[in-house]
């Protein structure tokens, strides 16, 4: 997996943010960028996925994830991203809704073609 992120950092398709307190990492989050086919308005769109949002248990409920998430959203806006998506646990739903994320209008389906993928 680290090869994927290293490539993303090298080609500017991955943004990582780390929160520290007294030299100790207390939270982090990432943004993956990808170009998608366009429509009648544009040839292509830049979209992003928020991933790996995490705050260590002792640092939770202090706004760290909110700060990281807002910085990732601002970075996405600066880069011209048209849409952000993410997968979340029940615990994270409130955070994502609080900054404007909604469930998609259309159901999302997937077909796993590799039985090694979770």
Give the ranges of each region predicted by the language model.
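Residues at secondary-structure transition points
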Residues: 40-45, 63, 87
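Conserved GNAT acetyl-CoA-binding A-motif
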Residues: 69, 76-88
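Conserved acetyl-CoA binding element of GNAT-fold acetyltransferases
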Residues: 41-57, 109
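Conserved beta-strand in the GNAT
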Residues: 18, 24-33, 49, 54
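Conserved acetyl-CoA pyrophosphate-binding loop and the N-cap/start of the following alpha-helix
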Residues: 59-71
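Conserved catalytic-core motifs of GNAT/GCN5-like acyltransferases
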Residues: 33-38, 85-87, 93, 97, ...
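Active-site rim helix/loop that mediates acceptor-substrate recognition in acyltransferases
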Residues: 1-16
């Amino acid at each position: 997996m680290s090869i994927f992120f290293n490539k993303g950092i090298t080609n500017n398709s991955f943004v990582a943010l780390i929160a520290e307190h007294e030299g100790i990492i207390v939270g982090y989050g990432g943004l993956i960028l990808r170009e998608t086919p366009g429509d009648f308005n544009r040839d292509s769109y830049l979209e992003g996925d928020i991933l790996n949002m995490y705050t260590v248990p002792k640092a939770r409920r202090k706004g760290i994830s909110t700060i990281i998430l807002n910085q990732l959203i601002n970075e996405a806006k600066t880069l011209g991203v048209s849409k952000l998506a993410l997968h979340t646990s029940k615990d994270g739903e409130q955070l994502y809704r609080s900054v404007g994320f909604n469930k998609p209008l259309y159901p999302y389906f997937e077909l796993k073609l590799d039985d090694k993928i979770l």
